[in-house]
Amino acid sequence: FGIKGILSPAYLKPVKYMEKAINQQDINLLKKAVPDEYAEWMTDDLEDDMFDLDSDYKIKIKVTDKEKIAKKDLEETLIDDYYVLDSIAEDAKAGYILEAEATLKQDGEKDTQDITLVVVKVDGKWVIVSGL
């Protein structure tokens, strides 16, 4: 991370975990990016399917925009718009909708897609609850 890592907002931490997990094909790192309830769903089957890319690839996720979800709307927005589990939405203390570009480099080719990630603070930890 260096200086940039020190200055990065805490809500970006799970995005970096996700990026690193995909690049290193590490399901345990990915579990750090999501709520415990989601991590429980990540079985060996998911690990096998998820890392079905050749070893010669790299993904880069660049957040291009953010929108803070108003505290008063947080639970309702998470449940109604992003289908987050009620238990997680109820415990969320803050949240952001992040617009990002995910760029996959593989075999000299580059493919960029726009993605939307939703991050929330639950039990003092920022996690991704939508957009995986």
Where are these regions (language model features)?
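Short, low-complexity N-terminal intrinsically disordered segments enriched in polar/charged residues
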Residues: F1-Q24, K32
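Generic signature of mature, soluble extracytoplasmic domains
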Residues: E19-N23, I27, D56, D107, ...
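Surface-exposed, charged secondary-structure patches
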Residues: E47-E109
